């Protein structure tokens, strides 16, 4: 059995599990990187105790990508975490959602946009019967 994530040196941090799954899905859909090449962590809100515990358990992490929500609480907590990790020797990146409040909103919007440009199987079958 292979352990996929042990050697990853990057963690992407989200507020909610659905956002972490959406972030991974966006990597797959948009071909923006190896979705298995990073750890995904959901804080269950904006408290960063889970991040501290994760970093203790995975000391090899050198790159932290903060993907918190695009609202006041998410933006404030992002700045708090950046200050908290200052001097840790880790690279901290703020990657707020490009569309909507969170990464699930982004995934929904991207998926809807892709669907506008796709031909459905029903359309193909209907075209063949004409």
Predicted regions and their residues:
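Short, small-residue-biased leader/transition segments that mark boundaries at the very start
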Residues: 3-4
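Short coil/turn connectors at secondary-structure junctions
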Residues: 8-9, 36
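Conserved beta-strand elements of the Class I
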Residues: 11-13
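TOPRIM fold recognition
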Residues: 25-130
């Amino acid at each position: 059995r292979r352990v996929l994530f042990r050697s990853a040196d990057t963690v992407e941090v989200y507020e909610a599990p659905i956002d972490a799954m959406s972030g991974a899905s966006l990597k797959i859909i948009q071909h923006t990187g190896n979705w298995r090449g990073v750890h995904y962590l959901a804080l269950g809100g904006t408290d960063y105790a889970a991040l501290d515990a994760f970093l203790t358990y995975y000391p090899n992490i050198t790159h932290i990508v903060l993907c918190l929500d695009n609202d006041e609480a998410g933006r404030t907590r992002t700045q708090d975490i950046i200050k908290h990790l200052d001097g840790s020797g880790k690279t901290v990146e703020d990657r707020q959602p490009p569309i909507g409040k969170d990464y699930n909103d982004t995934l929904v919007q991207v998926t809807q946009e892709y669907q506008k440009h796709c031909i459905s199987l029903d359309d193909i079958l209907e075209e063949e019967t004409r």
